[in-house]
Amino acid sequence: MNGLRMTQYGRGGGCACKIPPGELETLLSGLTDAAADAPSPFSSPAPSTSGAPLAPRLLVGPEHGDDAAVVRVGPSLAVISTADFFTPVVDDPHTWGRIAATNALSDVYAMGGTPVMAINLLAWPRETLPLEIAREVLRGGLDAARAAGCPVAGGHSVEAAEPLYGMAVTGTADPERLITVDRAEPGTPLTLTKPLGVGVLNTLHKKTGEVFPEAIEVMTTLNRDASTAALAAGIRAGTDVTGFGLLGHAHRMARASGVTVAIDTARVPVIEAARRAAAAGHISGGSRRNLAWVAPHADVGAADEETTLLLADAQTSGGLLLAGELPGHPVIGEVLPYEGSTVLLR
């Protein structure tokens, strides 16, 4: 819009602007006591003897840092709740809206659910940026939600120093078929459904304004089809790869499941332009923080720094990392019994 560059109005960009994972875990430490006394997550609720509705039961809370919270509201129905928002990741307002909404919807797909309703979350510097630009952002979010068959039912807005946009999304799922981070079992292959590298390219875009259509294609592609295929394949362990990078999300899944995740670095798909950008040094601070967080728990073998930084690249609206094989998507490693490190690079 008239040469306006949205990325210049925020210090971070996309999921790279998340609070660093180590700091986030310290922040949340001790705030999960309520979940500690909850019944076994995958046990069925006690039957009602009075005919009254069954009381909701928390199935997935904050204990493992899963993609969304899940509560059982009936014998065969669970409700998924998530929220996600961030600063501009691209300069075009409409495209930013599409990416932010696609990213928010992904948390429901990552749990094996179906989005049923979304509400907008908007922070806007109205004295700096015209509201007509905010309208374009919201229109982009609406277009992404429509593509997902998910109505946008309102939202909340505040004035702020930097623009922020995203969505709170509600979804539904079969409680017996949830996909969670703590169910990876040794002997299963590891699948990744989107290539890495959008964080590197977003960093370069913010610096130069150069547009990378391949990165936009990745970030605006819904994880719906991959989620549906994962459920059909009986997969029960997985997560989406976003701000903590492939290494960070693999570490969290391995830690929650008590296993080692082995990644064959040569088999990990990476956008070719991102390889060139990484070699030129266009790595975000968020990606470096991701690597520093995972490094004490990982065996990187002979992998060089450029490779490990790409694997730690902070993704925005990335693909699904699944413990299981999904036709049409690359197998990038396997789940092993715990071998002293949560992540093993080969």
Enumerate the predicted regions with their spans.
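Glycine-rich anion-binding loops of enzyme active sites
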Residues: 74-90, 95-98, 114-207, 211, ...
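Small-aliphatic-rich amphipathic alpha-helix that forms the alpha element of a beta-alpha
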Residues: 93-119, 136-147, 222-234, 246-252
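Acidic-glycine-rich active-site phosphate/pyrophosphate-binding loop
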Residues: 69-80, 220-226, 291-301
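A generic local secondary-structure boundary/capping motif
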Residues: 58-60, 68-71, 107-109, 142, ...
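N-terminal glycine-rich anion-binding loops that anchor highly charged ligand groups
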Residues: 19-20, 33-37, 59-81, 109-116
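Glycine-/charge-enriched secondary-structure boundary and capping motifs
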Residues: 2-12, 18, 23-27, 36-56, ...
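Short pre-catalytic strand/loop immediately N-terminal to key active-site residues, enriched for Gly-Thr
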Residues: 94, 211-220, 236-237, 307-311
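Active-site/ligand-binding-proximal alpha/beta "capping" segment
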Residues: 200-224, 228
